[in-house]
Amino acid sequence: MKIANVEIIMFPAKSGDCILLHFIKENFRILIDGGYVSTYEEYLKPYLMKISESGAKLDLVIVTHIDRDHINGIKKLLEENGNSKCPKIIEIGEV
C-alpha cells in the first residue's frame, strides 16, 4: 500500500506484527517488529535479501515489545545477519 510518499508493507505474522515503512523520497526504511520466526523466514528475509541486492538498507529497526510474536523474527534476523560491518542479509543502521 502506498500513501503519498510512504510505502507500507505488512507481512503476514499471524497474531503478531511485522511492518516495513519505506519513505520513498528519502529512501528511508523502518522495520517495526518482526513477527514470529516463520514470518521472518517465509516473508521478511526473502524481501530483505531482494531489496539489499539493489543497495537498500534498513535505517531503523524498532521492537515495540518483547512478546515472541513481535520479537522472534527480529532475533533471527540479527542472528543470521551477523556483524554489522559485513552483513549477510542487509545493512542495518540502528536497532
Residue spans for each PLM region:
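Active-site metal-binding motif and surrounding structural segment of the metallo-beta-lactamase
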Residues: 41-95
